[in-house]
């Protein structure tokens, strides 16, 4: 079964996101705190004719970290070179990328927490003093070569900031916490997407879609496409609040933005463990999902919406979870 509320990109979504991507901070909807800070830091760097300090963007998937990296490069008026932590398998791969940078370039590394430690260590001197030392040759004939780099800005994106080593984290002069979007910002994003793709949607429908999209633009845009399909086949093409509710109900997305996996997590906690506390590993086994998947993909939203609490002894289902699923809560 397809999970429409998965915040990782599916199929051609990365291509679609590039089409929808804003170019400058003034066009970027939401994340006002991060934008306001970046605007000052970028203008100051341009005024001094310096490269921007290295930037770490962290937060759940689908919140626009990659888009923000491109916006930063556009605001600086420089080129952006993109890679990812898993793609840089050895230090030589990173050396080749660094050696190809021009003065002022932005190097964007997505999933930076997944870089091997040997690769990460190459970044330390590159980030701090713009040089790297590389070994040439092997055995007794090997020698170290000092390679100066042009000033550049590294932008790292991660969903797991806690997995970054302290030495790497300390080298980022700017950090931006990307948070779940407010409903009004998400409504505006949905209306913008609908306008770009020439969809007819009412404000009420956009607002309802925003409320059920887990505060995540990627999910909102995905659901919008499926609601459009429903409107074209089951209606006259207009996306109104009635069509939106019927389409999302068909997709098993309830009025709180929970789908069958979220509900399965809560039901397991309530029915099998009397609401908890239950360990994350135990919970993951019971719902047949990987521990990291539960921790990264499902749990953050359930906690943010007040359905689950983290405690020292495990996860606990809240009164809101009982009420939402129609369970009667008995005191232990």
UniProtKB/Swiss-Prot annotation:
Pfam families named among the record's database cross-references: AAA_lid_4 (PF17864), RuvB_C (PF05491), RuvB_N (PF05496)
Intracellular or extracellular location(s): Cytoplasm
Keyword field: ATP-binding, Cytoplasm, DNA damage, DNA recombination, DNA repair, DNA-binding, Hydrolase, Nucleotide-binding
Residues reported in the UniProt entry to bind ATP: 20-21, 62, 65-67, 128-130, 171, 181, 218
Gene: ruvB
Binding site for DNA: 291, 310, 312, 315
Region (Large ATPase domain (RuvB-L)): 1-181
Subunit structure: Homohexamer. Forms an RuvA(8)-RuvB(12)-Holliday junction (HJ) complex. HJ DNA is sandwiched between 2 RuvA tetramers; dsDNA enters through RuvA and exits via RuvB. An RuvB hexamer assembles on each DNA strand where it exits the tetramer. Each RuvB hexamer is contacted by two RuvA subunits (via domain III) on 2 adjacent RuvB subunits; this complex drives branch migration. In the full resolvosome a probable DNA-RuvA(4)-RuvB(12)-RuvC(2) complex forms which resolves the HJ.
Lineage, broadest ranks: Bacteria, Bacillati, Bacillota, Bacilli, Lactobacillales
Catalyses which reaction(s): ATP + H2O = ADP + phosphate + H(+)
The protein's name: Holliday junction branch migration complex subunit RuvB
Comment field on protein domains: Has 3 domains, the large (RuvB-L) and small ATPase (RuvB-S) domains and the C-terminal head (RuvB-H) domain. The head domain binds DNA, while the ATPase domains jointly bind ATP, ADP or are empty depending on the state of the subunit in the translocation cycle. During a single DNA translocation step the structure of each domain remains the same, but their relative positions change.
Biological-process GO terms, alphabetical: DNA recombination; DNA repair
Source species: Streptococcus agalactiae serotype V (strain ATCC BAA-611 / 2603 V/R)
GO molecular-function term, one example from the UniProt record: four-way junction helicase activity
Signal peptide positions (record): none
